[in-house]
Amino acid sequence: MDFSQLGGLLDGMKKEFSQLEEKNKDTIHTSKSGGGMVSVSFNGLGELVDLQIDDSLLEDKEAMQIYLMSALNDGYKAVEENRKNLAFNMLGNFAKL
């Protein structure tokens, strides 16, 4: 590889990363717990965009806390897994050059 091309290559990767981040923002990851009594949705940037709690849980604070923690943790894991996949794909594209 010609090192004089490295700057252009890095600029290209930066642009590709920005495009992937923008596209990723529109990706939604939904996790449920308690048999669907709690549902959380995150966009690809890790921002919580929706939270649904079944009305029957409003009387059972402890169960609601457990289900919320479970759904949130699963949602965060899905977002992180997606980020890893994007990073590996970018590195794979870089290796091809």
From Swiss-Prot:
Record's keyword annotation contains tRNA processing: no
Cell inner membrane keyword on record: no
Predominant localisation class: cytoplasm
One GO term describing the cellular component: cytoplasm
Signal sequence residues: none
Protein localization: Cytoplasm, Nucleoid
GO MF assignments: DNA binding
Keywords: Cytoplasm, DNA-binding
SS bond list: none
Subunit text: Homodimer.
Family of the protein in this entry: Belongs to the YbaB/EbfC family.
Function noted in UniProt: Binds to DNA and alters its conformation. May be involved in regulation of gene expression, nucleoid organization and DNA protection.
Protein known as: Nucleoid-associated protein HP_0035
Native source organism of the sequence: Helicobacter pylori (strain ATCC 700392 / 26695)
